[in-house]
Amino acid sequence: MAGRSGDSDEDLLRTVRLIKVLYQSNPPPSSEGTRQARRNRRRRWRERQRQIRSISGWLLSNYLGRPTEPVPFQLPPLERLTLDCNEDCGTSGTQGVGSPQILVESPPVLDSGTKE
């Protein structure tokens, strides 16, 4: 699973369950009452969410020895990335489905500001 050397999967699962209980103990505020009452409930809810987020980070870093932020993701070289949308772009969920298209010649992204 996602454990490092020395960490057991049970410790990770127990910590994740605890964090899940913390988030479930703070449901979103109701939309009833006056505008001021709704605003106060949202403000208090956001503050509790911030506290839960910091407690979760503390649990992950101190109890399991993991950073709260994910490990940096290695991106492909810039030459392979394009903004070409000549064909049907579709929705973001369908983009990239099918045969991959890699441009041989990359278009200039930043020009000097003059049009040709």
UniProtKB/Swiss-Prot annotation:
Alphabetized InterPro entries for the sequence: REV_protein
Gene Ontology terms: cellular component: host cell cytoplasm; host cell nucleolus
Region entry Homomultimerization, spans: 18-26
Post-translational modification: Asymmetrically arginine dimethylated at one site by host PRMT6. Methylation impairs the RNA-binding activity and export of viral RNA from the nucleus to the cytoplasm. Phosphorylated by protein kinase CK2. Presence of, and maybe binding to the N-terminus of the regulatory beta subunit of CK2 is necessary for CK2-mediated Rev's phosphorylation.
UniProtKB keywords: AIDS, Host cytoplasm, Host nucleus, Host-virus interaction, Methylation, mRNA transport, Phosphoprotein, RNA-binding, Transport
Phosphoserine: residues carrying this PTM: 5, 8, 92, 99
Biased composition (Basic residues): 36-47
Intervals of motif Nuclear export signal and binding to XPO1: 73-84
Localization (cell): Host nucleus, Host nucleolus; Host cytoplasm
Coiled-coil residue spans: none
Main localization category: host cell
Motif (Nuclear localization signal and RNA-binding (RRE)): 34-50
UniProt entry tagged with the keyword Transit peptide: no
Disordered, as annotated region: 23-48, 90-116
Molecular function (Gene Ontology), one example: DNA-binding transcription factor activity
GO biological process terms, semicolon-separated: mRNA transport; viral process
Transport listed as a keyword: yes
Source taxon at top rank: Viruses
Remaining remarks: HIV-1 lineages are divided in three main groups, M (for Major), O (for Outlier), and N (for New, or Non-M, Non-O). The vast majority of strains found worldwide belong to the group M. Group O seems to be endemic to and largely confined to Cameroon and neighboring countries in West Central Africa, where these viruses represent a small minority of HIV-1 strains. The group N is represented by a limited number of isolates from Cameroonian persons. The group M is further subdivided in 9 clades or subtypes (A to D, F to H, J and K).
Family as reported in the entry's similarity comment: Belongs to the HIV-1 REV protein family.
Subunit structure: Homomultimer; when bound to the RRE. Multimeric assembly is essential for activity and may involve XPO1. Binds to human KPNB1, XPO1, TNPO1, RANBP5 and IPO7. Interacts with the viral Integrase. Interacts with human KHDRBS1. Interacts with human NAP1; this interaction decreases Rev multimerization and stimulates its activity. Interacts with human DEAD-box helicases DDX3 and DDX24; these interactions may serve for viral RNA export to the cytoplasm and packaging, respectively.
UniProt free text on domains: The RNA-binding motif binds to the RRE, a 240 bp stem-and-loop structure present in incompletely spliced viral pre-mRNAs. This region also contains the NLS which mediates nuclear localization via KPNB1 binding and, when the N-terminal sequence is present, nucleolar targeting. These overlapping functions prevent Rev bound to RRE from undesirable return to the nucleus. When Rev binds the RRE, the NLS becomes masked while the NES remains accessible. The leucine-rich NES mediates binding to human XPO1.
Full protein name: Protein Rev
Gene: rev
